[in-house]
Amino acid sequence: MRPLDGITVVALEHAIAAPFCTRQLADLGARVIKIERPGVGDFARAYDSRVRGQASHFVWTNRSKESLTLDLKHAEAPLILARLLAGADVLVQNLMPGAAARLGLSYEALRAAHPRLIVCDISGYGADGPYRDKKAYDLLIQSESGFLSVTGSAEEPVKAGCSIADIAAGMYALSNILAALIERGRTGQGKRIEVSMLEAMVEWMSYPLYYAFDGAPPPPRAGAAHATIYPYGPFPTGDGRTVMLGLQNEREWRAFCDQVLRRPELTADERFSTNSRRTEARPQLREIIVQAFDLLTADQVVARLDEAQIANARINDMREVWEHPQLKARRRWVQVDTPAGPVPALLPPGAADVDAVRMDAVPALGQHTEAILAGLGYGAADIDRLRRLQAI
């Protein structure tokens, strides 16, 4: 039995933040009914065609869900939604600001009709305040949260390589929903959860915020290196490759000098006697490290780092991650079905094995419409009528 077996989630969702949240609920056993626009669906279906003609974002965030096509603005939609929500435990939505209320799905209306329902609203900026009506996409929230200001090189800010603001919001939505389900078990009452992408990202920005507390200068942009710990970042090796390494304390600094650089005299050099001084003397220390590594291959550098118990990593590309020996050794890849055939998917972190989670198919658009409506009491003639009316 999975943790959320028996829980039903209705999702009015698109893009990444809400779908990422609800996919994880599905991973844990919840039944997730994804409502999509007839003929078009979640617009993330059209982001690209990299996975055998399917969008990479959509394949990632939508396995194990049921797809119901429904025109939310159609006159027939309120009754269908009412029947769905009568049997639901959770409603997750990330529609445009104000759209849910215009559809009659304000929290006040939902609470009156379904007092046990947990309602999770995900938005860019929250339901009030001067930014409440602004559109919000991942990169825009990276900008507003200050993330771009501390990411990249000294010359140019750089965005994260994945949808970090969407992921942050999705994770906080997930944890709040799980907490609300526990709370409902005690009180018998649902509740409203409001997750703002901006607030999720600003929480993740707490270290640079505190670093710049009381008007102090913020952490400098340092590329792939750490802004305030050194050496902690990428270094080239003599065979044209790159090794990432990180030191966290003075014991590691001494081991790095003795066993990796093989220059023990550096431990007595006042320029490098503390992390703060090493950070201030970054250009001089980097030159010393690069000169030493230029005489070694990446494998030799890694061997020395491992012997000295210095944390290190290779900078893998996506092909190398697919083939990562650690993930293979731990059997973290499983096959999931899609409309274009099976593809590999990573077991959810924390899952002991495939039996502990749901890893079902990525749905085709509207694949489950008839079955879901039949479960709500609609007969074949009713469903045909709804199709003729273009409600589904």
Regions found by a protein language model. Name each.
Residues M1-R186, R221, A364, E370-I392:
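N-terminal helix-loop segment corresponding to the beta1-alpha1 unit
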Residues G39, Y125-G126, M197-V202, D239-R241, ...:
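Glycine-rich beta-alpha junction loops
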Residues F58, A222-A227, G233-P234, L245, ...:
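Short Gly/Pro-enriched turn/cap motifs at secondary-structure boundaries
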Residues S67-T69, I141, R241-G246, R358:
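Short hydrophobic-aromatic micro-motifs
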Residues G170-G190, E203, Y207-F213, C257-R262:
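Oxidoreductase and adenylate-handling cofactor-binding alpha/beta cores
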Residues P231-A308, N312:
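Aromatic-enriched alpha-helical interface/lid elements that frame and gate functional surfaces
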Residues E307-V357:
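A glycine-rich dinucleotide-binding beta-alpha-beta segment and adjacent secondary-structure elements
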Residues T338-R385:
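Flexible, small-/acidic-enriched active-site or ligand-binding loops
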